[in-house]
A protein has these predicted regions:
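Conserved class I S-adenosyl-L-methionine
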Residues: 1-47, 50-54, 69, 128-157
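Class I SAM-dependent methyltransferase SAM/SAH-binding core
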Residues: 47-89
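A conserved beta-strand element that flanks and buttresses the S-adenosyl-L-methionine
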Residues: 101
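Short catalytic micro-motifs in class I SAM-dependent methyltransferases
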Residues: 104-107
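A short glycine-rich, Lys/Arg-flanked "PGG" loop and its adjoining helix->strand segment in the class I
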Residues: 113-125
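Short alpha-helix
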Residues: 156-171
Length: 174
């Protein structure tokens, strides 16, 4: 069963609300400040391709395990290359991307450490691994936890992280 199937079409509608527009503008400002110049971007857990449409890389690749999200992403971001795959086993050669983006992805994977190791494996030397998570004590995580407790997918499967150690390197650039 695809836990994202019921919301794939409406996934981005939230960004059009006043609060959603504010949050996404802040996220975009933060992201653009972290992203180095380069040719290639891989987004793991790309969803509907929101970031793939907005980030300035000539080669953009989205990895998404949800067939429903993948279908919407291919329609909304046809300029990107889309691959149905899981973050724990990325189907790319080592050192293939200048930037790897994991944005609200680690909450939904089975093996966080494996995903981070895979991201590091496909990252070129000097590249940037950018990770965005819903912090465990945040109001957003509390809301999604409540939805999950009520059985609302995909939040019923989400895990919220108190901290992230990037595949053996505890250094985080903020």
């Amino acid at each position: 069963m695809d836990p994202f199937a019921f919301l794939a079409e409406a996934y981005e509608a939230w960004y059009e609300t006043p609060l959603g527009a504010y949050v996404i503008a802040e996220e975009e400002r933060a992201l653009k400040g972290l992203l180095p110049p380069g040719e290639s971007l891989l987004e793991v857990g790309a969803g509907t391709g929101y970031w793939l449409r907005r980030l300035p890389y000539p080669r953009r690749v989205g990895v998404e395990p949800s067939e429903a999200m993948l279908a919407v992403g291919r329609r909304r971001a046809p300029e990107a290359t889309w691959v149905r795959a899981w973050g724990e086993a990325l189907p790319f050669s080592g050192e293939s991307f200048d930037v790897v983006l994991l944005f609200t992805t680690l909450e939904f994977v089975e093996d966080v450490e494996r995903v981070l190791l895979e991201a590091r494996r496909v990252l070129r030397p000097g590249g940037a691994l950018v990770v965005g998570v819903l912090e465990a004590l945040s109001p957003w995580a509390a809301l999604y936890r409540r939805l999950g407790e009520k059985g609302v997918l995909p939040w019923a499967r989400a895990r919220f992280l108190a901290r992230v150690v990037v595949a053996g390197d505890p250094t985080l650039q903020l």
